[in-house]
Amino acid sequence: VINQLKEEGYVIEAVQNKGYHITKYPDILTSGEIMSQLTCVDTGSTTGIIREVVYYDETDSTNNEAKRAAERDNAADGTLYITESQTGGRGRRGRNWVSPAGSGIWMSLLLRPDIAPVNASMLTIVAAMAVQEAIHKVLTEDGHDAECRIKWPNDIVLNKKKVCGILTEMSAEMDYIHYVVIGMGINVNTTEFDDSIKATASSLYLETGDHLKRSRIVAAF
């Protein structure tokens, strides 16, 4: 078990007559890592809207995974799909969203809301507010006074540079929603951007100078 944990990135030291002590936790986004931070110790139930986490080392798109699961497996409301990297990440209007491994949070939340389709657009705004608050919470805890704001309706900017984009997709009939998928891409520890976007895009690392543990942000969502 100790060797397996070390392979996963944990730094473990042996303490004489006491066993082992974990001195450094890896920046991983596995289902277990995220759920451990979402579960209430007293009740054993999850807090917030996320009920289950499905993790992939790599996928084409977490939005696609969520939609496939919703249609094929009747996946439950509150299921979060998250991956280390996407090969076909996308933003609004079909724009490509670069999603390299180990640098960001690429996730999609599946919802089955009991609301009219005409009101579904508000879910994007609610998601933007939740992401903004999660980023602000983590940065504040780490002593950063960065200016994190929502650029309505679906972008999060830090010091006036885009660090997060949100893509919402829906399957519905005229008066009934089958499901909504809210995809979120957060540039956390990204160190460089393509010349075509580096004037307007950034990451939490570039704006603060600190590498942040990604699972903390997911758990704060």
Task: Give residue spans per PLM region.
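Long, positively charged amphipathic alpha-helical accessory segments at protein N-termini or as interdomain linkers
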Residues: 1-3, 7-8, 116-148, 158-221
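N-terminal lobe of the biotin/lipoate ligase/transferase fold
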Residues: 2-140
